[in-house]
Amino acid sequence: MQTIDEDLSRNLGRWHRIAHAAGLRLGGQALPQAIADQLRELQRGLTGERTRVATDYMDERGALRAYLLYYWTISLCETAAALAELRARRQLPEIRSVLDVGSGPGPAACAASLFGAERALLVDKSELALGAAKEIAAAGKQAGFSLEVSTERRDLEDFRPPEGSRFDLIVASRSINELWKDDPRKTERRRDFIRSILPALRDGGLLLLVEPSAHYTSIPLLELRESLRGEELNCAGPCPHLRACPMLAREGRPCFSEWEWHAPASIAELAEGAGLDRTSLKASWVAFIKGPQAAAMARPLLERDSGAAEGAA
């Protein structure tokens, strides 16, 4: 199990407190158990029966409050953990601008701010969630963060980036799995969606896709990775190569990372009240580097270091 370093954990805690306060303001004086009950209902709709997936649940104040008080911080930390892993491998490009697709109230963009991001375009179909994202970003600036956000309300299936726009990072956290979920051609349609937004990613920029670790979200993500092989992308993580996914070859086993995590007290309390296990972070994710310089960055570190040593000899 991997760990998150202390400095990053401290800043994640600052963002958590900001989002937590926004969630409390959204819902008035509801008792903790009432919020836990809302969380349990939301969790069942997203990861159990999945009846809430691809619906307008974030336009319901109660559901959005439960999300802000629980899932927001989890998405924040999962995205940050993946970015930290890429940084440790020396595969994280300079990040100043972010396109956050299916952003919800912005946890992924806030995570990117801890790795240099200064401005972000958030795209989501929920006006209420985008409003919460702007509120959180504004409070973040008052707390010393420097993230500027703009928003576009749009169904992702109809979204195309602004003409001429270029971003250092395109991130989709827990959103791609909701696209065309009942379509037999969902992998191809998700691939085509990624292709449609790639012109907005600069050469050398990072595409990061993060999903829950469950089998029904991990396997489709791995299948999407396979469908993107041979595009103008090179895989930077978790596997730093473009060979066929070894986990899919093992009868479709899920692939996910797990990080040690000491949940904030409010998260732990809600998890206990809702009957959820939250002793670590788990997420499936894939990261790609775009462009001609991507090939060198995407080679395994040992291979790159070996080549550098030979050149110095």
Predicted regions and their residues:
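N-terminal auxiliary segments of SAM/dcSAM-dependent transferases
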Residues: M1-V53
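A short glycine-rich, Lys/Arg-flanked "PGG" loop and its adjoining helix->strand segment in the class I
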Residues: E188-G204
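Conserved SAM-binding loop of SAM-dependent methyltransferases across substrates and taxa
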Residues: P105-A117
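C-terminal lobe and adjacent flexible extensions of AdoMet/dcAdoMet transferase-like proteins
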Residues: I267-A313
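Class I SAM-dependent methyltransferase Rossmann-like catalytic core
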Residues: T55-A82
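Conserved class I S-adenosyl-L-methionine
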Residues: E94-G104
